[in-house]
Amino acid sequence: MVSSVLPNPTSAECWAALLHDPMTLDMDAVLSDFVRSTGAEPGLARDLLEGKNWDLTAALSDYEQLRQVHTANLPHVFNEGRGPKQPEREPQPGHKVERPCLQRQDDIAQEKRLSRGISHASSAIVSLARSHVASECNNEQFPLEMPIYTFQLPDLSVYSEDFRSFIERDLIEQATMVALEQAGRLNWWSTVCTSCKRLLPLATTGDGNCLLHAASLGMWGFHDRDLVLRKALYTMMRTGAEREALKRRWRWQQTQQNKEEEWEREWTELLKLASSEPRTHFSKNGGTGGGVDNSEDPVYESLEEFHVFVLAHILRRPIVVVADTMLRDSGGEAFAPIPFGGIYLPLEVPPNRCHCSPLVLAYDQAHFSALVSMEQRDQQREQAVIPLTDSEHKLLPLHFAVDPGKDWEWGKDDNDNARLAHLILSLEAKLNLLHSYMNVTWIRIPSETRAPLAQPESPTASAGEDVQSLADSLDSDRDSVCSNSNSNNGKNGKDKEKEKQRKEKDKTRADSVANKLGSFSKTLGIKLKKNMGGLGGLVHGKMGRANSANGKNGDSAERGKEKKAKSRKGSKEESGASASTSPSEKTTPSPTDKAAGASPAEKGGGPRGDAWKYSTDVKLSLNILRAAMQGERKFIFAGLLLTSHRHQFHEEMIGYYLTSAQERFSAEQEQRRRDAATAAAAAAAAAAATAKRPPRRPETEGVPVPERASPGPPTQLVLKLKERPSPGPAAGRAARAAAGGTASPGGGARRASASGPVPGRSPPAPARQSVIHVQASGARDEACAPAVGALRPCATYPQQNRSLSSQSYSPARAAALRTVNTVESLARAVPGALPGAAGTAGAAEHKSQTYTNGFGALRDGLEFADADAPTARSNGECGRGGPGPVQRRCQRENCAFYGRAETEHYCSYCYREELRRRREARGARP
């Protein structure tokens, strides 16, 4: 029972009232008080307190709720042997207090990162899971044995788009995923083959322990906050049985970088990096009493690629790190290599004692993240794999794969070329290691997604020459590898004769290759049939045995010694998709079994046993990989990820997280709605305040204002009057005479002060943009137009109509734009001054209509932007018998601006041009 694991606290509320002071809390003191008041384990107490940001009252409340949880909510196996019947197993209050430092979440960004993941959905459940995992990892028989677990994200496709996006932002390192995908390092396999699942990087705490955090997340779904993996890493490097062998492998890989006197110092520094001690140390009493101010999150030393290799030995499973090869600056230029990417195998542990499913990590911006897949409704539709090659089908680096041996003399044997040659791993040897430690598979790439270079060629053309050259290169590579691996024995004439006989026999059997290849490719089979030679025989052996085990090749029985291998391989291979191998079913000899003799495949290989060192699986992988390097990219060489094994608390953690995420998502949506409503209310209030404001004065009375140039593009909208002539000078003079009788006092003052042309507008007319103002065709009895200041900002200085900005004027378009029936109304003279109410009606007759920029609204009384607004209207005198001065279109043809009487009804620019033209004309007279 959970209630038996968690004793009943005595006077919890009293303790909270006495001890809770958020300004002077010391975390060690709070932890001690919590343990003293509840009797809980320090690990559980610490998780509860950290989950509530060291709020003692809230942590005690969570503890009380946890006690009331029914046993059915937790697996029964965890409570075995933990009840009050065995008091000797109950932890003491001082147990596990010797931690490096207590973590606090003062930093808001760090707190968000630490509190948003699955591992913080329920601190109590995660603490129980951590304790269970720690008990499994401390098994007496295998002190470093780790159970095979692989974490998977829940299926998010069942949720709405908004909630799914919220969870992805909450759990996934978006920056890492985008960077690695754009670099072509991550999820390129799901692009070329839809049957492969995408891998997503989980958000990981960046405190220097991100490598172990990422490994813990990839297996169990929570961070390594108890430093279980970190301490195991340090212990293995310091006192582990594999210490010397690991050191030799590390030194061999670093041989070209260090000098002899630097080795011990480098190894000591490397050992210190793995320590579980943080960079910053604090006393247990929190310093001088100000625990909150003097304490901070511990930051650990960043780990290197060798620590990944040691971690593979601790977990006893391969580790694949997906990373870019070069570190780039902000401009994308590469300036430093990134050595982390590649494959790390537990080479110092026999393959039969290792887990074959690799742990996959991502590395970007000096930070590790766990790469996990997502559950699917139909698990058979997509498979979780990790390619062992890059997108160019080149094998990933195999780190620390060479051990020179105990008898290697550093500084002496380094110059022995013969001994160095024995230690160089060929591609064949690397593939053999991968087949030994992992479940490898070849995934067929659909023809429609293959790269152009990898498209199958026509089997009827002369493409056989290319295939023959490929076969020759494979034969030469095989010969070189065999001669290198068997350099002590050499290759005598008898072996060469056997090789020749084998090639002749392979040619006679080439007719059946296309039928026996299955998923390999019919096109490639036809090429092999033409003149493949050695490669056809290499593939023939494996596929023939697989088909015979499935009952598809009964007429080609093999030797008796291969029957066991045939039955095993036949049950594994699928003819339609891929061919995979398992380490538990290997015919490949492990590194520890090579000295005992040849493998079953070598013994049953007939005349090829001595000439070929590795199994048929390795031969097939080598041939396909070589073909991929030559352009025949039809398969992806990948390792299978086993996702069926999960720890007992996986479902509870996922359930708690989804519930918490739904609550946070609902709160976020509600906050957004409130913010939107507040913004809308503020906008409405601002609009109302703008409408109530007094009209703006566009200019100071008596001072001319320079005309404004439109901010829009330099496109001119004009009215070309081809059929009807523009108003002549006589009409202009009549209009000026009429305008003089209806001018307001303010207008007269302006005219008196502006005796000359209005300065200010210097750009030429074609580079300007404006709005067409057209006078009404007749007198209308309507109310005075609102002031300019009361209009919307978008209508105050209207833009040019977008639909006409890119096309020239035509009479048909002009007819649709104008509000008058004839062009003569544009030149209609204004009648004389009208007394009293007649003046008001006359002013209303000449109100202008404005076309705004795309709004389609006609604004009465809105004057042209380049012209001065009537003083009477700006002063609010509308309707009081004071009509403003009348403006007319510029007399110059094709000019869309307006002029005043003092400028002879030219616009200011045209008026200056007209004056200049007149001066030039007078100067040209004899």
Swiss-Prot record:
Q: Where are the zinc fingers (A20-type)?
A: 884-919
Q: Where found in the cell?
A: Cytoplasm; Nucleus
Where in this protein does the record say Omega-N-methylarginine is found?
A: 880
Q: Which SMART domains match?
A: ZnF_A20 (SM00259)
Q: Which residues form the OTU domain?
A: 199-374
Gene Ontology MF annotations: cysteine-type deubiquitinase activity; DNA binding; K63-linked polyubiquitin modification-dependent protein binding; zinc ion binding
Q: Does the keyword Cytoplasm apply?
A: yes
Q: Where is this region: Disordered?
A: 75-99, 452-514, 537-613, 668-768
What's any GO biological process attached to this entry?
protein deubiquitination
Which disorder does the record name? Answer: Neurodevelopmental disorder with hypotonia and seizures: An autosomal recessive, severe disorder characterized by global developmental delay, language impairment, impaired intellectual development, hypotonia, and early-onset seizures.
Q: Does the record's keyword annotation contain Zinc-finger? A: yes
Q: Where is the composition biased (Low complexity)?
A: 481-491, 576-592, 677-691, 729-742
Keywords on this record?
Cytoplasm, Hydrolase, Intellectual disability, Metal-binding, Methylation, Nucleus, Phosphoprotein, Protease, Thiol protease, Ubl conjugation pathway, Zinc, Zinc-finger
Q: What class of enzyme is it?
A: hydrolase
Q: What does this protein do?
A: Deubiquitinase, which cleaves 'Lys-11'-linked polyubiquitin chains. Might be required for PA28-20S proteasome assembly.
Protein name from the UniProt record: OTU domain-containing protein 7A
| Sites where the protein binds Zn(2+) | 890, 895, 907, 910
